[in-house]
Amino acid sequence: MQCFAEMTPADLSLGLNGGLAALIGADGQLLAGAAPAPEEKHVLLPLPLGERALIFGAGHIARSLVPLLKTINFRPVVYDCRPECVNQVNFPDADQVIVGDFDHIADSLALLPDDYIVIMTNAHSHDFEVELQALQADHAYVGVIGSAKKTASVNARLRERGVTDDRLAVVHTPIGTAIKAVTPAEIAVSIAGEMIYVRALRREGGQEAHHGCPMH
C-alpha cells in the first residue's frame, strides 16, 4: 500500500452502517477502498507505522537482526551489492530487499530523517562510503559495526572528506549496547536494544527514557 511504502500517516475509515473500509491519507486523499458516502457515519482509526530500519550489509548479523527488529515494530529494509546475499529467501521478514551500489545509495534508496541506519557491510570501504552518505543529513539513528581501531581510522578519513566532529558524534560506534555480545545473534540483540532505547528517547522528546521496568 502507498502509505506503508512511503511511510506517510493514514487513517482507516470504517463505516458504522456496514459500509466498505477505506484508507484515507493525512491530506484527505483516498488511498485505497471506497470513499464513504457523505451521509454515512464512519470512524477513523489511525494506522501506526513502525520506524524504518535500513540495514546495509546482508551478512550473518543482519540475518539475526531483521526478524528481531520485525517483532519490535521496526520495518527492516536490507541493502547490499550482492544479489546472492540480499533476497527474500535469506530475509523473509524484511519489508524490502534492495540490490544496489554502496557508493551511490540515492540511485536505489532515499535516506529519510526518521530512518534508523545500521551499517555492517562486508568491507570497511563499503562501510565508509555508506557512513559518508548517511552523515550528509540527520537521521533518527546511525550505527556502525567495528572495533575502536577501525572507528578511529574511518573517522580520520571522514574528516578528510569534510565531515565535522559534531556530525561524527551522532554515530553509535561500536554499535550496540555493551552486553559483551559475541555471536551474530547476541550482536543482533545488542543492536536492537540500542535502537529500542534511542526510539524511546525520541518518543519522549529526547529526555531520559523511563521504561516502567524494574530492571531500569
PLM ranges: what are they?
Residues 1-81, 85-95, 112-116, 150, ...:
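Segments forming oxygen-rich coordination pockets for charged ligands
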Residues 66-68, 90-91, 110-111, 129-133, ...:
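Short amphipathic alpha-helical segments
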Residues 74, 139, 163:
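Short phosphate-binding/catalytic loops that engage adenosine nucleotides
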Residues 79, 116, 121, 132-157:
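ADP-ribose/adenylate-binding Rossmann-like module
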Residues 95-101:
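Conserved SAM-binding strand-loop segment of SAM-dependent methyltransferases
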Residues 103-113:
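Short amphipathic alpha-helix with an adjacent loop that forms part of the alpha/beta core around
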Residues 125-127:
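Short glycine-rich, flexible loops that bind phosphorylated cofactors or substrates
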Residues 145-216:
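Adenosine-phosphate binding glycine-rich loop
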